[in-house]
């Protein structure tokens, strides 16, 4: 479950986050991060050797918002509408 404040530092704008970073910082799971990416709610900006996804830090904010909205009872379809997708 995401919290309002992170206990860990988020990388600066130029630094990319791994799927593991996204899961840890949003207090979710790797599976959750992959699910939200597959649904189009967050977008990986690159894939490293070995297929590892990398995300811009702004995608962390989108993930956290989506998690809060799901917790509030909104469907994925409703969240997509709110995100303009």
Sequence positions of predicted segments:
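Residue-level detection of the helix-turn-helix DNA-binding "recognition helix"
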Residues: 34, 38
């Amino acid at each position: 479950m995401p919290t309002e404040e992170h206990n860990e530092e988020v990388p600066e704008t130029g630094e990319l986050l791994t799927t593991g970073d996204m899961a840890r910082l949003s207090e979710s799971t790797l599976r959750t991060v992959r699910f939200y990416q597959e649904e189009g709610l967050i977008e990986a900006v690159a894939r490293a050797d070995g297929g590892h996804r990398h995300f811009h830090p702004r995608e962390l904010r989108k993930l956290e918002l989506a998690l809060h909205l799901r917790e509030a009872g909104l469907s994925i379809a409703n969240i997509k509408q709110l995100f303009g997708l």
